[in-house]
Structure formats: structure tokens, C-alpha cells
Amino acid sequence: MSSFIRQDLVPPHLGITRQPIVLRNVSSRDIGAILSHVSDNDVHALGVSLRLSPKDGTVDVVAFATSTHIFQVSLGDQTSLAGNRRVATGDSLSRLLGNVNCHLAAFDMARVALHLYKQCNVHVQGIDLSTLFSGLDGSPDTPAELAYKKVHPDVNRHRIHAAWYRDEVKDVCLRAWLSAVIAESSPDALDSASKVETTNLPDVHLQCLADLMTNIVLLEAERPTHIENDFEDVTLDEDGQLVITNERYSNRVRRSKQTSVILETAHGHRITGEAVRAEGKRTGVKVHGGNFRGGIERISVIGREEPTHAERARDGFILRLLQGAISSLTRSPFVRALWFPAPQPRVGRGSGDGEDAWSPQLAALNESQKAVVRAMWADDEPVVVVHGPPGTGKTRTIAVSLEEWDRCGEPAWVIAQSNVGVKNIARTLIKHNVDFKIIVSKEFYVEWHEHLYESIERRLIRADELIADPVEVERMIGGSTIILCTVSMLSNPGLDSCGIYRLAPVERLIVDEASQIDSFEFMHLFDKFHRLHKLCMFGDPKQLPPYGKETAPSMKTIFDFKHFKPTAYFLNTQYRMPVPLGEFISEEVYNSKLKSVHKINDDSCVRFVDVRKGAEESVGLSWKVRCCIVSFVFVANL
């Protein structure tokens, strides 16, 4: 069935494309109609886009397009096909997705290829438009940027951005259509481009990557595209730009080419703009519509921000794998250890007799902590997984290991999910006289969190201060071989170019808060750091799960890999909670394996209050239980 669709991405008056565009709804059993159109019209490039179900990440709609025709395909009817017809459909789809005479073109082509391979069990060959014209830095182009460069400067960039974060069927179709328009404008570049080819990887690797990327898509679908901003003031600077003074770091207006900033007055007057710069608590906004007269009462950000450095590094790794630029997914022993393990003989654990004499800090640890330190120092345990309940001395155990590495001049990087987690490790290392440096992003530090680092300011390096001058970087590091940062900082391209990995190679990687980190975040890092030979993961899977676990239940932390459970270490003594409370937690949460050492032993330190009549009430972005609050006040007054 044919109809028409009108696009609003490229102004019609430019005469670049035909209006309206023919739209054909095609069932998965009629893929041959697309093949016929490609053959009959000698189509050189076919744009492609897809939509995934927010429930389970399966592909429900695929759009194929030329500059004049869009074919909307529903894949949801595949399961209803009889055997022979399903085979025929698969054959047609395979010929379409692997056609060497007609280039499939898409933004994030690696993702598209993995999703189609997983859903349809067919191999895909295509071209990634986002990196087709990348410069020397390899930064990918957004659809709006590439349309501006290759189609016309007057394209509607904000509408193009919106088409890529919205998932209405029309948006899916227009994404495929614009991909085709851009591809058709550069036939020579398509012919010489590196191809994304699923045949570059074995099926087991493709399935693994497809499953991991499905989790990512589910998480991205949950991200808000409308965020309210808390602000202190809005002023006009000498260049005519608005300056927002943000009140909260968590919802600050960030510099972005892909989002729109909406400022509203009490009378409904609206100003729209783009956040073009950010410094500390202030964000500069270039006004695109409306006049500023003061009295701003509400600020919101519409759209989806650019990927982080870590997200770009992850996606770039997957793209290079499928293009054949990386020889194998499993060239890192740590990728093999996590996702493709081979049977390993159980490592014997020595007693460490005599070590206490030459390591006083080790002598002060309990036996479970000593066992972990010995494993971290051992050459025959490349992966050390440590389950540490609260108050069991995880950070202290890490510090003792680092103290020895620091004494021997052996480099180690210590990372955590959050800046606060990294800072807490730094405080412990100071007590152990470990020489270290801590790298913090300018965005997090300046004006927002400088007070957190006052006691370690001389050890702090701002990431933006690491310049590509080997002498200056060496001066800043100052001989330190222990480096602290967040897991995302390891993907910052500034660290790659400044030479810090030459001065302090990533040979040992210690991860705190590992139970809150999706293991997929490490895959590209394992491949990146070829000298890595020791990985130590600390966390507590009984506490906070990684963000998004409810949305993507198949997400795994290191503690979800069953083959590590028999050899994982357990820190079995807690020192933080009074003994009665510790024993209760041990019995209810840790299978009675957690011992308690504390000066408070009396049962009166614990009170249980029945609040079965309580109910959660929504308060802003959080929840409260009024009955609990009343109970807390009552108990406090006893």
C-alpha cells in the first residue's frame, strides 16, 4: 500500500528533494518489492533506520529509503510466517542487507547491523555515515552536522536532532530518508568507505555484542528528553548572549549543539536558544527566538545531549570491530576472561607466612583482607573479584596493596563509578602515605565541588590541564605511579594525547564500586590497554545495583558472571555497625557469613518499628513515607 509523507528536515523551497515522498508499507514477507525497486531504478545507496521496542529491545519497524521513496517494514509479523515463507523472507532480506551493488547507509551503522543480525539472523553490510567524513580526530558527525555540510546550510538542524531522539514511525522513516539523501550526495565517498560487515566476526561474538547493545538501547530510551533546570539568575552579557547561573550540578544546562534551551516568564513569554558555552556554574545561551526582558521563572532543556567520551569510545570500538580495523573481539585476555571464559584450574591460595614481617600494614589486616592483598600481589591471578559488605575495609585493603606497589614504583590505576567514590579512596591513601595523583574533570570541579578536594589539592590534576606537552605532563605527574579517576575518565581523548599512559601505564586496574558498573563499560578499555595484566574488582552486589538494572534486567556487573563466583573473595568482618545490628544484617543479607567487631554489643542499640500502614508519596523526583518520618521522630525522643 502506497501513500505520501512530507518531510520538514530540508526546506522544500531549496528544490533539493521532491515533495511529497512516496511511502510504501511493506510486510516482512514482501521484502522482494524493495529489491525490485533497487534493481529497476539502479539504486546506488539505500538509507536505513530502525525502531526498537522499549519493552524488550526487539526491532519492530525498519525503514529503507531513497531520496524519493521510503519503504516501511514491520518485522513483528515474522513469527507468524510458515516455515517455507520464513526461509524465503530471510533470503530476500539477506540479499537486501548484503547487496554489494547498493550501499546500505545509516548513522550508527554498527548498531543497526547488530540489531538486524540478532533479530533476523542475516548478515549485514553497510556504511556508517557518522564517521564517513571524520577528520583527523575521528569525531563522528551528527546527522544535523552532516546534513548542514553535505545537503544545505539551511537544513532544519533542530528538527533533524528531534527526528533522531523521537521514535514515532514518521521519525524512523525520515531518518532513513535523510540518510539516503546524504549518501546520494557523496557516491565516491561511499565506494571508498570502510564497510561495516557482520561477517568480520564469528556468530558467538556477534550475539554477545548484540545482546550488550540491546541493553544500551533500552537504557537510552529511558533518558528524559525534557529536563527542568534549577537556576539562580539569568542575565544578558555584553555579547548579547544570555547567561544562566545554575543552582544544581545534577540538572545544570550543559553546552550542547543537539538540545534547545527554553526560558519562560510568568506571562508565558518564551525565549529559545542553544547552550554554546559553560564555565563553572554559568552557561551561555545563544538566543534563536524571542526577546529577553528579564523575569525568567522557568528554564527547561529539550532534546538529547551528545554522547559522553565513554559512550563514544564504546561505540567506536564496536564500529572498528565490524569494519575489521580491530582484528578480534577477544584479543584482550580480560575480554576473554569475562565474556568467553575457558575452563581454568583452580588457583592454590598460599598462606603468606612471613609476609607480615616486611609489611606492617598487612600485619594489621584481618585474615580475609590479607587473602585479598596476597591475591592482588600474586602473578597467577589476573582477575581478583572481592565482595566487601559495608564496613569491611574494602578501601583499606586496596590502600595496603597500593602502598606496596607505590614503594616498588609499579603503576596502578584506581577507578570508581562516581567522583565521590574516587575522592573517598584518595582520603584513605593519604592516611597510608601513598603517593598518588587524582584526575578530575573541569566541569565537575570548578565552582561546584572544589571544596571536596581542599585536603588533597596538591595531588589534584584537572583533565583540561593535561596538554600534549610531555615535559609539562611529566612535571604534573611528578613521579607518581598511582593514578585515581572515574571509569569514564579513562575514555577521555585528552588522556590519550597527553602521554600520561606512557608515564603511568595501565598495568594494574583496581575498580571500586564495581557492583554499580555495567561490565560492558570495561570492554573497550580492556582492548585499549594492552599492558594491563591485573584486574581487581571490589563491590557489594547486595547493595545498590547499577543504574538502569530494572530497565535492562540482563545487564551484568562482574558479580553476575557465574564463573567468577567460586573464586571470589569475601571480606568477612565488618567494623562499622554495632554487633546486634551487624548480626541481623549478616543473617538476613549475607547468609550468616559476616562477622561483627564493634564496641557496642547491647541489643538496646536496635529498635524495629512496624510501619506496615505506611505508603510512598511522590515528592519531586523522589519519594517519602510519612509514617516512617513520624516513627523516626518518636524513636528519637525515647
Give residue spans per PLM region.
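Pre-ATPase regulatory/linker segments immediately N-terminal to the P-loop/RecA-like helicase/translocase core
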Residues: 191-196, 242-377, 427, 431, ...
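Acidic, Mg2+-coordinating catalytic module of metal-dependent nucleases/exonucleases
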Residues: 144-204
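Conserved helicase motor core of SF1/SF2 NTP-dependent helicases
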Residues: 418, 488-490, 503-638
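Accessory interdomain/linker segments of ATP-dependent helicases and helicase-like nucleic-acid enzymes
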Residues: 190-268, 635-638
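Conserved DEDDh/DEDDy metal-dependent 3′-5′ exonuclease domain
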Residues: 45-46, 50-154, 162-164
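Conserved RecA-like ASCE P-loop NTPase motor core of nucleic-acid helicases/translocases
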Residues: 390-392, 397-430, 437-440, 569-574, ...
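N-terminal accessory regions of nucleic-acid-interacting proteins
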Residues: 1-45, 198
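Conserved P-loop NTPase motor core of helicases/translocases
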Residues: 356, 410-416, 420-509, 518, ...
